[in-house]
Amino acid sequence: MTNTTTALISSWCYFCFCALASLAVHATASEAPQVRVFNTSFIGHRDSTGVESFRGIPFAQAPMGERRWRRPVPWQGDGGPYDATAFAPACMQTGSGLAWYHGMMRRVGVDPALMEGPVYSEDCLYLNIWTDLDAEGKRPVLIFIHGGSNTGGWSYEPNYHGESLVKRDVVVVTVAYRLGVFGWLSHPEMEARNLALYDLAMSLEWVYQHIGKFGGDPNRITVSGESSGATNALHLAVSPLSQGRVGGLIHQSGGWPLDDTPDRSEATARGIELARRALDGQTGLEALRQVPSERIMALAGEVYADFQLDPIEDPESLPVTLESMAASGSIAAIPMLIGTNADERLMYLKAGGTLDQLLQRRVAIAQQDDVRAYLSGAGDELAQRNQLGTALDFLCPSLELASLIEKNDGAAWVYRFDRVRPGFDAIGAYHGAELPYVFDRHDDWLPSSKVDDDLTAVILDYWTSFITKGRPRSDQGGPWPTWSSTQQTAVFNDGVSFKAHPDRELCRLLMDR
């Protein structure tokens, strides 16, 4: 057994010891809710509807100073009460997540100053829980992993709060993980790679050991994520670090690592270059740990400008990459709900780009004429670029994932989200558009209608039944067939319809299906 494996097992054993020593304390209606975990009493908040929230619960010690670029270490309380009524700082980032929200607000004529961003810190490994402590029995658990290209976002963005899911008998947990080079650096002197994946694994283990005190069932954990959060959820599910704790997976608008896993040697070369620039030609990791985080982020923006920070092959955390699994046709048959939005790429297309450029850069020469002919029915060139970009980065690898699950005797359900909000024609069913429906958290500034309210109810039916029963069902929406050779897909728009995936032929052309 390696020293690194021994250290990891020791961390899990600490969690087990904590679980045996845990004690839950339910408050009366007039008191703040309290839950005791090991030697710490977490004091939460109860809202007017009876939903309790526990915010900013630490699951690991601050990965700062000498702990920067090391595996996470379990948090240990000091035996006193812990105020869990406020969210903790978000992980270090440049603010791209907040900029996304501000851009959306400008589109609908709302002053972005109305939304303030979080505080950022390297001390950021916290989780948040929404629950009903007075509900009977143990309820299934949803762990949600936020997106943001692995460089931005935070666990308590407005769309991720869990009150509505709690009302449907789900305990909701949202988790943080180190972002950018703080979570994804590869350097020859590091003891481990994919540190953000270790963060997520530690948060999963914390939930497994302690969620029972918050009313959750540790044996019914579904992990969900959107965009890079979806790919991280999938990586966590297939990683040995998860120890089989993931019972189901919801994969929203991810998929690209099935086609393109970052090269480990290239990732390491970038890490060395980051150190060289930060240390005036030196490359030592210990010295790099002393460089201020703001300086690290500024340099990382240059060094990694054209490099996607995603999990890389690693003997302990990811011995087999998703790309290798796709190539071999073998993957763990975890039940999965998988989908994409119709216009994932539209709002990100750069002015001046052309379809020819995209075809030449991303599509094999032998396929270009057939793909061009297919796209001719999509509308103008902007629509064609969106359709192709969405298919390449999100749709086709997601369908490939569903087919892998089906091939390995698992169950997968596939959706496409097509709903365009009033006044949003310019960006369509954009990347992230489904999230307010999934959590029933429509921002006040988002234009909505009764159609959106009705669609939210149907989507909540399907998502919560998948979490609670392992299969998406809705009396309002009708039966949702599993993915098979007929490629039946739930299409969410004004309502829900079921048909063979509208763009299956495009994926066949691109992926030689």
Segments predicted by a language model, with ranges:
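Bacterial N-terminal signal peptides
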Residues: 11-23
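Non-catalytic accessory segments of hydrolases
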Residues: 27-193, 446-459, 467-477, 496, ...
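Substrate-access "cap/lid" subdomains that shape
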Residues: 113, 209, 243, 252-361, ...
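Active-site loop->helix "elbow" adjoining a glycine-rich segment at hydrolase catalytic centers
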Residues: 147, 196-199, 227-230
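Alpha/beta-hydrolase active-site loop
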Residues: 192-212, 269
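Alpha/beta-hydrolase fold nucleophile elbow
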Residues: 215-226
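Short glycine-enriched nucleophile-adjacent loop
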Residues: 230-242
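Mobile gating loops/cap/lid regions near enzyme active sites that modulate substrate access
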Residues: 396-399, 403-513
